[in-house]
């Protein structure tokens, strides 16, 4: 909410959620190419802060190009709005359990996620198409109940 107050955005009146916080930020500038990039990660509740970003952009004279990725596995939200190819990944893996420690995250291709799963489990793709393999992995039943690996497509828009 501090950023909203700084730019004079009446988020309550406009019904814009500002729940959450910015937990990482970085600024890069290339004067030669007339290019500046402000990157940050936010932790918000259930959905992206895109309406808020649009209001900040208006306050700055519509000078920004805004790209973002929204991930909320508990609600099956895997969405990217990308004006500059900052988020080219095709899928997001949700994973837990000892077998899949450090596997959760975005992957460049479905094939990369499938390959990782095959390496971790020792199960071969065995001629299955990419989509058949994704279905196979997402429906796979593990011996340990606290283990799962799911390949989720990222929707672009």
Where are these regions (language model features)?
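Intrinsic low-complexity, intrinsically disordered or marginally ordered coil/linker segments
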Residues: 1-157
